[in-house]
């Protein structure tokens, strides 16, 4: 059995249906962007939500919503309209979250900077030693500094 996490945007509003055995299933079409060489491509996944899971989220799931799903992965084979064999990635959803990078009804979601501007905060990036950094300082900062070096920790450093 394969399990995976996928982040993308809904290509359509959720579809609700009942199986022949009377089980309720909500189907989401999730577009996940991938990069092949220098070209961006979109892989479409069929995400099935079984029973009454995530019912409170359903009114907010619309075409263009950014979501993150996790669940069991399978491949479904079918015949296309022109008669050629096709396959589709199917995810049986165990976890569903709204993406912090999602869009609301075709527009982008408010970002952290937008929220800070609304309440009068100034957005500041903080460096490794707690110093404030501007955009130029961030470019000059070596993100791998200290990688591979042994670190000394005390009990207060460990969160558990």
Swiss-Prot record:
Homotetramer. One of its GO terms (molecular function) is single-stranded DNA binding. SUPFAM superfamilies: Nucleic acid-binding proteins. The keyword Transport does not apply. It holds the Pfam family SSB. PANTHER family: SINGLE-STRANDED DNA-BINDING PROTEIN. The keyword DNA-binding applies. It comes from Chlamydia pneumoniae. GO terms for biological process: DNA replication. Coiled coil: none annotated. GO terms for cellular component: nucleoid. This is Single-stranded DNA-binding protein. Residues 1-100 form the SSB domain. NCBIfam families: PRK06293.1 (NF004948), ssb (TIGR00621). Keywords: DNA-binding.
């Amino acid at each position: 059995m394969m399990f995976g996490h996928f982040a993308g945007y809904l290509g359509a509003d959720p579809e609700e249906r009942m199986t022949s055995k009377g089980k309720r299933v909500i189907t989401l079409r999730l577009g996940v962007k991938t990069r092949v060489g220098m070209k961006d491509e979109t892989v479409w996944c069929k995400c099935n939500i079984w029973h009454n899971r995530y019912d409170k989220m359903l009114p907010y799931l619309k075409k263009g919503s950014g979501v993150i799903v996790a669940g069991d992965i399978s491949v479904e084979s079918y015949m296309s309209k022109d008669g050629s064999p096709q396959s589709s990635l199917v995810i049986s959803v165990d976890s569903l979250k709204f993406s912090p990078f999602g869009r609301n009804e075709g527009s982008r979601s408010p970002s952290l900077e937008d929220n800070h501007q609304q309440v009068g905060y100034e957005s500041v990036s903080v460096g490794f030693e707690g110093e404030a950094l501007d955009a130029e300082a961030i470019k000059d900062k070596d993100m791998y500094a200290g990688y591979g070096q042994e670190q000394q920790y005390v009990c207060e450093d460990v969160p558990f």
